[in-house]
Amino acid sequence: MNNFISVKDVTNIDTLVQKALSYKAAPFRDKNLGTNKRIGCLFLNPSMRTRLSTQIAAQNLGMEPIVFNVGNEGWMLEFEEEAIMSGSTVEHVKDAAPIFGKYFDILAIRTFPSLKNREDDYSELFIKQFIKYAGIPVVSLESATLHPLQSFTDIITISECLTNQPQPSTNKRPKIVLTWAPHVKPLPQCVANSFAQWINAWGKAEFVITHPEDYELDEEFTKGATITHNQEEALKDADFVYVKNWSTYNDYGKIYTNNPRWMLNNKRLELTNNAKVMHCLPVRRNVELSDEILDGPNSIVTQQAGNRVWAAQAVLSEILQRNS
């Protein structure tokens, strides 16, 4: 693994999952792997779990993490080629990225979509320009369209739950449902896109996506999933329910509905096979998910968030070993 931008950078998902779980069991077993190595963590938008878990993962491997809040602490960057920089941008990524390449051994970057121009966001210009000019491995801490560390964490958590529960006598695959939820503002499709991409690539589940009409995601990521606008039908016999809001893709970045009927509660959960409930966090309580779900025995959101460390540690370990 040289870069980590999407599931396409992973040769074998299950092998990487086992590596992450081995770090969970023994966090410091490779504490010298990153000795005398630095990772630069660049944030172009806010972060809590991603920021902290990546720093902890790097330190567990002996690396020195350095966090730089680009928007607040540095110059405004220009990403367009041949730009005439007579506006608000001060430094071009062509000049900044090679410097990061001199300072660090790995560059981890978190960007965010504008939700104004779909073509611009889905071109992934920001992260592609860093890959092009930095000259060192790049890890996505979330991009305009994907959140691979979150989705890898989700697979780890699902695998962990499946290992710890009694196995059915049949070889029935678990049913995983990704359900849209209401929100007070339009959110990116990153987490939903990425989760769909990883579950489909993993290939070990019956995968259903449910959302209101007009909230279809990009088919590039959902191909292979069953898609329905009937949430109750989707939830029947589900083993895992992943709750997430996203804004519209076709009429880009819009909110068409905030119907509270789409918020998961205990009554809806009764339709499932006592499903585990997942969310990437942060979550708007009693908007996206009810208190009774989040505080109940079926919620595994804290387990998910805890596993962010081991996901990041497995990825950084792979990159360090590849480039040692």
Indicate where each model-derived feature is located.
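Phosphate/diphosphate ligand-binding glycine-rich loop within oxidoreductases
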Residues: G34-G40, S47-S159, R284
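Phosphate-coordination loops involved in phosphoryl transfer and adenosine-cofactor binding
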Residues: L33-I39, R173-K175, N274
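A short helix->loop->beta-strand "cap" motif at the edges of active sites that frequently abuts
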Residues: A134-I136, G203-A205, E270-K276
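Positively charged, low-complexity intrinsically disordered leader regions
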Residues: M1-L52, I56
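C-terminal helix-to-coil terminal segments
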Residues: D295-S324
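Glycine-rich phosphate/diphosphate-binding loop of Rossmann-like nucleotide-binding domains
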Residues: L44-I66, S159-V243
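Rossmann-like adenosine-cofactor binding region
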Residues: E220-S299
